[in-house]
Amino acid sequence: MDNFNNPTPQNALSPEEERIRQEKINALNKRLLREEKERKNGWKGIFWTVIAALAIRSLIFEPYNIPSSSMVPTLLVGDYLFVTKFDYGYSRYSFPLSLPIIPRGRIFYNEPKRGDVAVFKKPPENKTDYVKRIIGMPGDTIQMRGGRLYINDQIVPREFKGQELWNTELGEQLYTRYTETLPNGLVHDIYELTDENKYDDTPKIEIPPDSFFMMGDNRDNSLDSREFGPVPAKNLEGKSRLIFYSTDGNGWFFQFWRWKEFLRLERFFTDIK
C-alpha cells in the first residue's frame, strides 16, 4: 500500500511571513482600538465642555445683548452685557429653557438693592428676558404724577442736564436728560420726551412681598412695571454688571479696518450703574 504525504499548499506562508502578517493584524487592531478610545474621549470632552458652559451661564454669569432703547442713556442698542447670576440666588429662570430644577421660589436668595439694573422674565408669561432698573422695593407704593416719580408719596428729585437728539427705533427724537436720585442715594440718568405720555400719570401701586417695581431709564419709551405690574422675585435672573462690547450695528467685527466707525470703544468694559 502506497504511503502519501499531505502536500503543502502552494499559497501557505512561511513562518516568517506568518509572523509579519500577525504583527500587521495586531497593529491594525491596536490602531482601531486607539481610534475608538479617542472618539469616545472626544465625545466625553464635548459633553463635559457643554456641561461646564451651561453651569457657568446658569450659576456664574451670562452674556446678554440690548435690542431696544428702553434703558437709554444707561444701556444702548447694541450693548453686550455680562450679567452675574449669583447676586440674587437662583430660581428656575436661572437655567436654560427655565427648566424646573428649582420648582418654586429661590435658593441662596439675597434681596436686590434699589437702583440695580436687573434681568428678569417678564410676567405674566415668564418667557421673555427684560432688563430694567429696580425702582420699587417690597412694601413701597409707586406712582407717576405729571411725569414725576413718587416713592412712598415722596417725589424723587431730578436735576436737568440738557437736551439731546437721539436715534431710536422710533426715529430721531429730542430727549430731555435728567439726573435722578433714588431714596437710597443712588444717582442715575434718565431720558424724558414729555411729562404727558401714557405712563406719566398712574394710580398708586403697592408692591407685594418678594416683588419689585421695574422701570426703564428711557421713561417714555419703556414697557415696564407701569404696564405689567410688579415682578416677583422668582423671575429675577441676575444683575447687569459690565458692558464688554458695544456696536451701533453698522458693521461686522471682522471688518477691523472700520472698527472706529461702528464700534463704541469707549463703552467696552464699563461698569453698569
Identify the meaning behind each predicted range.
Residues 44-61:
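Hydrophobic membrane-insertion alpha-helices, especially the h-region
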Residues 57-71:
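Aromatic-capped interface at the extracytoplasmic side
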Residues 2-43, 64, 73-273:
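Soluble "head" domains of membrane/secretory-pathway proteins
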